[in-house]
């Protein structure tokens, strides 16, 4: 990492995907552990993903315990590197923005461009692996749904639509668990598909205004995508649907096997013969379809069942917004001790 060799020491690679590599690192001065993600900006797709992540995380003016925190971002071209800032006018930054807007490389392809993200280090893997490696626990389910509800309300309050909520993109931090808490801390991460809506002419002082920001790019992971995302006309209510898929799957331990990776994943779906169909796709075809909730348990708390049904409504107007959702999750967890039965 060119500009920060004296500041960070890369320890080991902890993850690798199609867009980049993640390392465990330490801050030399303090010994604190951080995660360093290196994204190679060699294609318009990679550039757009990296910029979206930077724009979303750098737009947040305060920290939230359940949202990954961006310490800094460094942009590197060959041996030249500089710390990025929101709204930068540097030539390196503007070249990447132009590439993202035009959908084609606008800089010298012989140059090696990288974006380095320094973020919280999460030592517990992702939510999917964590839950599936343990027996179901009401305490864990309660803790996780409250943390996720709080995180989503925070993001929407900051005009950020995540657009790819799924257990693989929710990290586990066991080392930073609050004192007295028996459960680990969740961190919503991977903002490569996110959208910041504050620049769309909306009133940033109006908490629910993010739900009036209409988007048209169909993106995300199919088993967590809302019906309207498949159509290409949606708002932040698509995040509510995705969280509904996650919570329902978590409570009942509903899983499926990804065809490409053969990995077992948490996620609710519709069974059609021998095939499993994403909920959003099935509801798009049949908006009046009744979801079989609970699917595996003999019974489910009436308040929880009703909330999941509303979160997974085919009509986004019938879903609670993130602020109502957060309050209802707290109410269910605190007032109804049998919610997970």
From Swiss-Prot:
Organism, scientific name: Danio rerio
Protein name: Serine/threonine-protein kinase pdik1l
Reaction catalysis annotation: L-seryl-[protein] + ATP = O-phospho-L-seryl-[protein] + ADP + H(+); L-threonyl-[protein] + ATP = O-phospho-L-threonyl-[protein] + ADP + H(+)
Keyword Transport annotated: no
Keywords: ATP-binding, Kinase, Nucleotide-binding, Nucleus, Serine/threonine-protein kinase, Transferase
Keyword ATP-binding among UniProt keywords: yes
Domain of life: Eukaryota
Record PROSITE patterns: PROTEIN_KINASE_DOM, PROTEIN_KINASE_ST
EC class name: transferase
Gene Ontology CC: cytoplasm; nucleus
Record-level Gene Ontology MF annotations: ATP binding; protein kinase activity; protein serine kinase activity; protein serine/threonine kinase activity
